[in-house]
């Protein structure tokens, strides 16, 4: 698969577009911009789900946004190596159910862009147990396990 040309204007625009898309995670932004960021056959995976295809990614993001009160990503830096882009970020999240209990998580997105500068591969790495801890019984178990080590 051909990827965006390193050092090109398209590469810079792809990076900027990705960073801008994730500044605020909301249904409005997803609906308005996802098709400018992700390619049709894109692959996405995070700690909750693995999704292939732009329509499926959009549906997953919109479903996720339904539970969010506010979610922002502060992208700290970007590393590039042989067509792979690594975005290191801090997510600040409050859910509709737990508005008074903000979650801050450090994570990283491994991304590849196609030749048009759209995301074709996106794998997120972060500690999803920070969200699971909020669920009454599951949270108790996770906290207990953490205390054991």
Spans of features found by a protein language model:
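Short, low-complexity N-terminal intrinsically disordered segments enriched in polar/charged residues
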Residues: 1-32, 36, 148-149
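A beta-strand edge to alpha-helix "cap/lid" segment located at domain peripheries
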Residues: 1-6, 66-72, 79-149
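A solvent-exposed, acidic/Ser-Thr-rich amphipathic alpha-helical stretch
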Residues: 12, 31-83
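A structural signal for well-ordered alpha-helical scaffolds and beta->alpha junctions
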Residues: 15-18, 54, 104
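General structural signal for alpha-helix termini and helix-helix connectors
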Residues: 24, 43-44, 96
């Amino acid at each position: 698969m051909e990827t965006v040309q390193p050092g090109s204007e398209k590469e810079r625009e792809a990076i900027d577009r990705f960073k801008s898309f994730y500044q605020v995670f909301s249904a409005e932004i997803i609906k308005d911009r996802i098709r400018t960021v992700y390619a049709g056959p894109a692959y996405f995976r995070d700690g909750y789900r693995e999704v292939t295809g732009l329509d499926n990614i959009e549906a997953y993001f919109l479903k996720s946004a339904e539970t969010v009160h506010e979610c922002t990503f502060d992208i700290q830096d970007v590393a590039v190596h042989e067509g792979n882009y690594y975005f290191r970020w801090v997510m600040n999240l409050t859910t509709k159910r737990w508005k008074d209990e903000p979650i801050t998580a450090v994570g990283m997105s491994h991304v590849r862009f196609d030749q048009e500068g759209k995301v074709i591969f996106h794998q997120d790495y972060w500690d999803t147990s920070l969200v699971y801890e909020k669920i009454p019984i599951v949270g108790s178990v996770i906290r207990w396990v953490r205390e054991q080590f």
